[in-house]
């Protein structure tokens, strides 16, 4: 390889790196402040000292619009803490996904207050590469157990999207 070809290749690589670093610097993060409400139903099965719970429902929130949600969690019955995963699905097929950690407390017979902190790990469509955190703060009505329980609450937090 002659010196001229080597110089040309190095110059091309340097130009590519400059373009890539410039485009990354031009990308900006758009933060969406989310405030909304939701209603849903949950079911679960007790296994040993845990409750394997699944929930789903629908809601509407600022900056993201109407959504449906699915939550799968393992609840430690000794301390009412939970861990799991969630999906928020939008009418056009876009998705936000992530993990959750929660804590519940009984507020009355057949009722509980549950707060779940959601960590956004990504998404699809307009939420591709999304990060951030959301909070499900809900009241659960267990008067229809063992068939299911009803819940309603608020969704708050921030979604960060790279544009």
Predicted regions located by residue number:
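Compositionally biased, intrinsically disordered low-complexity regions used as flexible
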Residues: 1-2, 110
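Bacterial N-terminal signal peptides
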Residues: 12-22
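Beta-strand-enriched cores of mature, soluble protein domains
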Residues: 26-163
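General helical secondary-structure elements
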Residues: 5-6, 24-26
């Amino acid at each position: 390889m002659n010196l001229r070809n080597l110089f040309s290749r190095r110059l091309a690589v340097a130009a590519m790196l400059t373009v890539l670093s410039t485009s990354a610097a031009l990308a900006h993060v758009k933060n969406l402040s989310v405030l909304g409400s939701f209603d849903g139903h949950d079911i679960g099965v007790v296994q040993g000292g845990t409750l394997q719970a699944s929930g789903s429902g629908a809601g509407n929130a600022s900056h993201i619009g109407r959504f449906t949600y699915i939550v799968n969690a393992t609840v430690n019955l000794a301390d009412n803490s939970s861990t799991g995963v969630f999906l928020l699905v939008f009418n056009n097929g876009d998705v936000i996904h992530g993990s959750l950690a929660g804590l519940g407390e009984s507020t009355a017979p057949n009722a509980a207050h549950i707060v779940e902190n959601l960590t956004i790990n990504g998404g699809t469509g307009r939420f591709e590469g999304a990060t951030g955190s959301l909070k499900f703060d809900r009241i659960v009505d267990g008067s229809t157990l063992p068939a299911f329980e009803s819940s309603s609450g608020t969704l708050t937090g921030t979604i960060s999207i790279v544009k």
